[in-house]
Amino acid sequence: MTMSLEVFEKLEAKVQQAIDTITLLQMEIEELKEKNNSLSQEVQNAQHQREELERENNHLKEQQNGWQERLQALLGRMEEV
């Protein structure tokens, strides 16, 4: 009788340990999900910022080209004089 009680107590302890481990892992999974969501949001924000910077860069390049064309035209006129 005491042998089976001992085995039962060991089994109960192992089951409790497994439950505790599962609970901790579930908590860790939730934390990782939250971190993943946060990082996904940061990636999205970074992509939007990059797109905005690319648009601004293209606009500035267009302006630079416009100024270069004007400068070339002015230099051409000066050579004529």
Curated annotation (Swiss-Prot):
Its domain of life? Bacteria
Compositional bias, Polar residues, is annotated for 37-47
Coiled-coil stretches noted in the UniProt entry, renumbered to this chain: 5-81
Q: Name one GO cellular component term.
A: cytosol
**Which terms does the UniProt entry file under GO BP?**
division septum assembly; FtsZ-dependent cytokinesis
Q: Secretion signal: which residues?
A: none
Outline the subunit composition.
Homodimer. The ends of the coiled-coil dimer bind to each other, forming polymers. Interacts with FtsZ.
- Name of the protein in its database record: Cell division protein ZapB
Could you tell me the gene encoding this protein?
Answer: zapB
